[in-house]
Regions:
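Short hydrophobic segments within beta-strands
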Residues: 18, 85-86, 132
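Glycine-rich phosphate/pyrophosphate-binding loop
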Residues: 119-124
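Helical element adjacent to the flavin cofactor pocket in flavoenzyme catalytic cores
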Residues: 129-184
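Glycine-rich FAD pyrophosphate-binding loop
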Residues: 9-30
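Residues forming the Rossmann-fold NAD(P)(H) cofactor-binding site
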Residues: 2
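Catalytic-loop motifs flanking and including active-site residues across diverse enzymes
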Residues: 30-34, 142
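Dinucleotide-binding Rossmann-like beta1-alpha1 core, especially the glycine-rich loop
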Residues: 33-118
Length: 184
């Protein structure tokens, strides 16, 4: 909701946001601030569809973090600028084949042993370490950046006061807001 509110406002629309629970209390907080490009979907065997659709998300979000995207979130805190993914020897050959596929080529790099974080060096862990372009932002910081300029456009509403009108195919055709002053 907040992202869309910012986009609409940036494009000149007079928009407001009704929230029935807590701002960011759904997907924003559930994501833990993880911005990924679909590798988790690709690892499960889905190299098309969802994985392809979100492959560019890290690049898109990085542009927004620089203030160059469709929403300026340059004041949002970045917690980690990349992911590391480890695979043990049993999983390694299958993973190497997978990582060499066209859909992931150039997006993932093998980390040299001398560049391993202390944990991996100290424990002499067998396997391979990969650097992914995915990263982590501070979700509460993002909520603050997105909501701050729109405080006068944010409204908390009870779920019992809102009703969606639908056509015969269940498409939303209208919204009814009920209040003590009447129905809008």
């Amino acid at each position: 909701g907040l992202w869309l509110l910012n986009r609409l406002h940036n494009e000149g629309y007079q928009a407001i946001l009704f929230e029935t629970e807590v701002l960011g209390g759904g997907q924003t907080i559930a994501s833990q601030g993880i911005i990924h490009g679909g590798l988790k979907y690709a690892l499960s065997g889905s190299l098309s569809g969802t994985a392809s659709t979100i492959a560019g998300m890290p690049t898109r979000w990085r542009a927004c973090l620089k203030g160059e995207g469709d929403v300026d979130i340059s004041r949002c805190a970045l917690l980690c600028d990349h992911y590391l993914m480890w695979s043990d020897a049993n999983f390694r050959s299958r993973l190497k084949t997978f990582l060499g596929s066209k859909s992931l080529r150039g997006r993932i790099a093998t980390v040299a042993t001398d560049e391993y974080p202390d944990f991996f060096r100290q424990h002499n862990i067998k396997g391979s370490l990969y650097r992914l372009p995915d990263f982590v932002i501070d979700a509460p910081s993002l909520l603050s950046v997105l909501s701050e300029p729109h405080q006068d456009r944010l409204f908390k509403i009870s779920p019992s006061l809102i009703a969606f009108e639908q056509d015969s195919q269940a498409n939303v055709t209208g919204v009814q807001l009920n209040s003590t002053r009447g129905t809008i």
